[in-house]
From Swiss-Prot:
GO terms for biological process: proteolysis. Coiled coil: none annotated. It is an enzyme of class 3 (hydrolase). Zn(2+) 2 binds at D207, E246, H355. Belongs to the peptidase M28 family. M28E subfamily. Its main location: secreted. Monomer. Disulfide bonds join C322-C326. Its EC number is 3.4.11.-. This is Leucine aminopeptidase 1.
Amino acid sequence: MKVLTAIALSAIAFTGAVAAVITQEAFLNNPRIHHDQEKYLIELAPYRTRWVTEEEKWALKLDGVNFIDITEEHNTGFYPTLHSASYVKYPPKMQYAEEVAALNKNLSKENMKANLERFTSFHTRYYKSQTGIRSATWLFDQVQRVVSESGAAEYGATVERFSHPWGQFSIIARIPGRTNKTVVLGAHQDSINLFLPSILAAPGADDDGSGTVTILEALRGLLQSDAIAKGNASNTVEFHWYSAEEGGMLGSQAIFSNYKRNRREIKAMLQQDMTGYVQGALNAGVEEAIGIMVDYVDQGLTQFLKDVVTAYCSVGYLETKCGYACSDHTSASKYGYPAAMATEAEMENTNKKIHTTDDKIKYLSFDHMLEHAKLSLGFAFELAFAPF
């Protein structure tokens, strides 16, 4: 590990470790900067931008610095600065406890384990790699199978590939309701080894294979409701598996940018990033719980998320913070959509093996992942029928 770190840091030092901060106006006056210098425009906080090389992006992540890569979205002329979030009133209490409890009983740890074993068998799911494309193709087939077996496709449900220029595509499963008001549940499908992304293995069991199979199982459970599968819910529900989160939320930005342009009415977005590791909390003497982000999120939706945990999960929740741009909910927020995020524990007790060859299934708890699946299903069902 130390040798790999030295190699990575030497490469970073050679290219220059620090890039200059650049204003939005400077970019607009110099549209060729990115192409001439092969650098990327990242945002480390709202409106705080910097040009970096790809190696410098990975160095920042190794140092625990979050960012969102806004280069491609900026080049389209639709600069993704923060939009004001639309106000949405969420249900003050659960309305469908009986229905959700019955559906939650059918969620399967065995399904999640089998899916995660296959998903982590790809050498890496790095978004620029061929195996990243193959893993996305495998996942697409699983999502399509779940939708097909439920019968929902006969009532208009679809599964589509959202293409990106880097190769690995994002996946969108859409379960139409009686209106186009939409509830989104997301996870990112890509993985990365920060030392040598194009070469070294990145099983990504927890980050974010766990979230990927969690919402896949929640989708399967949700579609066992005839009302949902037959399109009788008030609202449309979408499940997203984003490409290139590790590169700076690239896939989710492309999707929510598209939604903003097309005036899509997104009423809620929940991101599940890392749902399987509990040993860190237990070692710290902290109770097993779901971590609920309380920074850079919609406060009303976050309160609703807490209420869902209390109503439908066997564990409680703990508030935590991850800073700006820690996962794909950032993209939804940037385009004015209410967003929330759940993770496996308080941030200080989350998995420290991520982004390495050792992010493996053996460290994960499928019992805990089941709680996140219950959370996802309850969130989706309650909001599918919410009177927005």
